[in-house]
Curated annotation (Swiss-Prot):
Protein name listed in UniProt: Large ribosomal subunit protein uL11
Family: Belongs to the universal ribosomal protein uL11 family.
GO molecular function, one term: large ribosomal subunit rRNA binding
Coiled-coil regions, chain positions: none
Xref: Pfam families: Ribosomal_L11, Ribosomal_L11_N
Highest taxon, organism lineage: Eukaryota
Keyword Transcription regulation set for record: no
SMART domains, sorted: RL11 (SM00649)
A Gene Ontology biological process term: translation
Amino acid sequence: MAEQKGMDPDTKYIKLQVVGGEVPGATLAQRVGPLGLSSKVVGEDIKKATADYKSLKVHVQLAIKDRKATVEVQPSVATLIIKSLKEPPRDRKKEKNILHNGSLRMTEVVDIARIARSSRSYSNSLSGTVKEVLGTCKSIGCKVDGKCPKEVTREIDAGEIKLPDQ
């Protein structure tokens, strides 16, 4: 695995996609078993760490050092948007490809952009990251301040909406 800045060379990293608030399935045992860890204990740690994202898909990074695993939750922008819409959890097995029809405030979009900027965004500026988040809002189907996210992007480009520098 490629070394990233700030990563310890003695630590093994495993990335998983799990459903928040649930114990991961058999793939966890296959990934952590050879490293000498109990999949049951690690599964419970993941369940506790992802409790805020109940029934949403979320990425988890396990950092394993000296037969101890630390869990870091890395939610995607889409997961953060759905969480801030505060919709009730759905049965993910029955309902697929759901369009979310809620509306976010622009301040919530900026907050999500700040979170995404720290780990996932490739943009040089906060306004670029906000536009990435607005594109995800469009894909999900939600509105921003009651408007289509594409309209809000045009207003940012035209200078009608002022965004903070950082």
